[in-house]
Regions:
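Juxtamembrane intracellular "pre-TM" segments in multi-pass secondary transporters
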Residues: 2-4, 185-215
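Extracytoplasmic
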Residues: 10-41, 62, 228-233
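Extracellular/periplasmic helix-loop-helix junction of adjacent transmembrane segments
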Residues: 32-58
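Helix-breaking motifs and short loop linkers at transmembrane-helix boundaries and internal kinks
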Residues: 41, 70, 91-97, 108, ...
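MFS-fold secondary transporters
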Residues: 85-90, 101, 105, 178
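Helix-loop-helix hairpin linking two adjacent transmembrane segments in secondary transporters
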Residues: 97, 134-179
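Cytoplasmic helix-loop-helix junction between adjacent transmembrane helices
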Residues: 101-142
Length: 235
């Protein structure tokens, strides 16, 4: 199978696209939320909440799995889940159905930004990793701007379903890209302990006051962001 250099520009571009996956999934359909609410007779804001719940829970799973079996397989599985979830969203005929598929979609979308950071950690030292993360952050900043603009143009000609079909197409392109990137977490560096042992470490972190202080600060920041995103389509 064709592979690419793990430190070339193409590899960086793929990681940037994976990092932007979450921002695109949450922001691209914001202009369509009022139409979705009317069409499905429900609160479209719940689909954003459902996505965030799925995204948060999925991190606990994919992180432990990727330390055990490597980065590439979870990436492939996650992107496939994202594609299937996006198809489900596009075909949804009720708000509850759409909500369920959004949670499912989030389980796949989570792998992009999470494992991109892990792959950078695998390949780079502290200084280089900081530079790479800065580069990827630029793309993450562009996605929330470009997504709603693109969706707004789509809604001129099509219904809200087209936005999720666009995410399907993006997911397929991401899957092709993921298939050619190299594995960055070699066998000798993978965790030899059980996944259950990793979950025990989560409890250790939750009992660490320093960790929880930083976590609450970051959480408060994102609460404000998503509160704004939820209400912005109706302003």
């Amino acid at each position: 199978m064709l592979t690419i250099s793990n430190k070339g520009w193409l590899f960086t571009s793929i990681l940037s696209a994976l990092m932007a996956c979450t921002s695109l999934s949450t922001d691209i359909y914001l202009p369509a939320m009022p139409e979705m609410g009317r069409d499905l007779n429900g609160d479209a804001e719940l689909t954003l909440t459902g996505f965030l719940i799925g995204f948060a829970l999925a991190q606990l799973f994919w992180g432990a799995v990727s330390d055990k079996i490597g980065r590439k397989k979870p990436l492939i599985m996650g992107v496939v889940l994202f594609i299937v979830g996006s198809v489900g969203c596009a075909l949804s005929s009720s708000m509850m159905e759409l909500l369920a598929w959004r949670v499912f979609q989030a389980f796949g979308a989570c792998v992009g930004p999470m494992l991109s950071r892990a792959m950078i950690r695998d390949l780079y030292g502290r200084t280089e990793a900081a530079k790479m993360l800065s580069t990827l952050a630029i793309v993450m900043a562009i996605a929330p701007i470009a997504g709603p603009m693109l969706a707004g143009h789509l809604l001129v000609w099509y219904t809200w379903h087209a936005i999720f079909w666009l995410l399907v197409a993006i997911g397929i392109l991401m899957l092709i890209a993921v298939l050619v990137i190299p594995e960055t977490h070699p066998l000798e560096k993978r965790s030899k302990k059980s996944i259950g042992h990793t979950y025990n470490n989560y409890w250790i972190l939750l009992r660490n006051k320093g960790f929880m202080k930083y976590t609450l600060c970051v959480s408060s920041f994102y609460i404000a962001i998503y509160a704004f995103l939820t209400g912005s389509p109706y302003v």
